[in-house]
Amino acid sequence: MSASTSTTAAASQDACYISLLGLAEYFRTSQPPNIKKCIQCLQALFTFMPPSKVEARTHLQMGQILMAYTQNIDLARHHLEKAWSISEPLANFDVKFDTASLLAQLHLQTDQNSNQAKAMLRRAVELSQHNVYWHCKLLLQLAQIHASDREYSLASDLLAVGAENADEAGATYLKVLFLLSRAMILMIERKTNDVLALLNSAGQIIDNNIPNPHQKEYLKVFFLVLQVCYYLALGQVKTVKPSLKQLQMSIQTIMAPNWPSDETIFGANQLEMFVWLPKEQLYVLVYLVTVSHSMMAGYMDKAQKYTEKALTQIEKLKQQEDKPILSVFKVILLEHIVMCRMVMGNRELAIREIAAARDVCLAAPQRSLLRRHSAQLHCLIGLYSMSTSFFEHAERQFLVCVSETNERDLKLFANLNLAIIYLRTKRDTDLKQILDAVSSENTNTYSSQALMGGFYYVQGLHAFHKNSFHEAKRFLRETLKMANAEDLNRLTSCSLVLLSHVFLSIGNSKESMNMVTPAMQLASKIPDIHVQLWGSAILKDLHRMSKDAQHEKDAYANHLKYSENLIADQRKSVQSSHHELVNWFHGDPPVTSGPPTTTAVAMILPDSSAAVGPVPVIASTSTGMQQAIQPVGQYGQFY
C-alpha cells in the first residue's frame, strides 16, 4: 500500500472516530439523554480496531457514562477495568489515572470494604509521580478513604507527602489545602500541638503568599472553620468568638452576588482546580459551627434561628443535586436540635427529630451514615429516655454508645450521664466505678473544658447526695471557674442552682439566694426549663423561710407552671409512636411513623428534681464535626 493510500485511510478512520464521538455526545446531551444510543456509538468505535490509546479512552468514556447515567455497575466495571489494563503500561497517558480514580469510587460503592479501592489508588499514586496534578489528586482521594476508615495516621502521612509535592511544584494554593486538610486529620487524632503548628504555618502562607484575592478568601474560610472547630472542641466558647466573627464575615464576602463563580476562580490553572467545599456548602457549614457555638454558650434562640436557616439551605441544595455531604450536615444539625429541644423541655419534638435523623441515616447508601452516627443516635435516645424517667432504657442506650464509639469526648459524655443514672438509682458501686474510670482516663489527656466542667459538676452532685456539703462546694466552685472563664452559660446556671441547694441544705439562706437568683436569670435566657423548675422550688423554700408569703406564692405558681408543662410534654412523648426507639439496642433502628418534624434546634438537659438530670454540658454528640469536615476534592468532584 502506498504512503498516500495509508494516509488517506488513517484520515478516513480519524473522521469516523470524530463523527462517532460527536454523535455519542449529541445523544448524551439530548433532552432527555439517549444513553443507549450514546453507548452504541462508542461501542461502534471498536469495530475500526483503534490504537491502544483511543481504545483505552473509549472504554473510560463508556465506564464514566454507565456510572453517571445507569445502574449497570457490572458493565461500567468491565469497561473501566479494560481501560486500566490497556492504559497502565502506556507512558505519558493520563487516562490510566482518571480510570484508577473512577474504579476506586466504584469499588467503594460496591465492595464490602475499601481494600481494593486503596490498592488501586496506591498503584496509581506510584505511577503518577511525574504528573503533579494527578499525583496530588490521587493522594487526596486515597487520604479521604483512609480518613473515612479512621486510619488517620496513614491519611496524615499522605497529606504530608502531598504538601511536599505541591511545594516542590511551586503550587502554593494547593500546598495550603494539603496543610489544612492534614490539620483537620490531626485535630481528629487530638494532636493539639501539631494542629496549632500547622494552622499557624498555613495562616502565615495565606496572609503573605496567596496573590489571588478570591482563592485567599476561600483558604481563609477553610482555615477559620478549622480554628473555630479547634476551640469548640476544647470547650472554649469565649476564646473562639473573634475567629467565629471573622468566619461569618468571610462567608458573607464569598456569598455576595458580585463574587465570581467557583469555575472562574479555580478553572484557570490545573494545580488550582481543587477546592475543599463549594461556597454553597461552606455557607451551610458556617451555619453549623455557629449553631454549635450558640448551643455551647447557651443561646437557644440563636441556635434555633441558625439551624432553621441551615436546614432550609440544605433542602435548596438537595433539590439542585443531592450530594452525600448534605445528609451529613443534616444529621449533625438534627443531633443538635434534639439536645436543644430537651433542654427546653420539648421531649416530644426531640424524639420526633431523633426519628428524622434516623431516617436520613437509613436513606444513605450502604448504611454508611448509620455506621458513623449509630453511637450518637444511641446517646440521644439515652438522653431522651433519661429525661422521661426510663432509666433502664437510658442505661442500655449509653452502654451501647460507649461500646460503639471510639470518640473519646462522646464516650466521656455518655459515661457522665451513666453516672447520673447510677446516682439517681442509688447504685453506689457502679457510680464509684464509672467516676474512677472517667477520672483515670481523662486526667492527662486533651478534653473539652465543657466536658471536664461537667465531670466536676457530677462529682459535686455526688458529694451533695452524700451530704458532703463542703466537698460539693469545692467541686462546684471548680465547675463555676471553668464555666465562667469561657461563658458556658448552661454549665454556670446548673452549677449555681446546685450550689444554691447546697447552701439551702446547710441553712445558709443568704448564700442560697445569692446563687439561685443569677441561676434563674441565666436559665430564663437559655431557656432551660429544668433549672427553672429546680430554682423555683428553692425560691419557694427560701421565701417560706423568710416568711415572704407573696414571693413564696409567686415561686410556687412558677414551679407549678414548669411542672405542668413538663408533665404534659411527658404524656405526649410516651404516646408518640417514635417513643418505641427507646427499645432499639442493636442492628438497624426500627422504622416508626408519626407527624412530620418541624424545622427546629438542638441541645442537652438536666432534670426537675434535686439536681439529677443529664450532664449540664452544651456539647455536641456529633464526632467533633469530622463528618462535616473532609479533605479537599478536585473541583467538580466534591466527594
Curated annotation (Swiss-Prot):
The keyword Repressor does not apply. Signal peptide: none annotated. GO terms for biological process: cell division; chromosome segregation; maintenance of mitotic sister chromatid cohesion. It is found in: Nucleus, Nucleoplasm. One of its GO terms (cellular component) is chromatin. InterPro entries: MAU2 (IPR019440), TPR-like_helical_dom_sf (IPR011990). It comes from the Eukaryota. The keyword Cell division applies. Belongs to the SCC4/mau-2 family. This is MAU2 chromatid cohesion factor homolog.
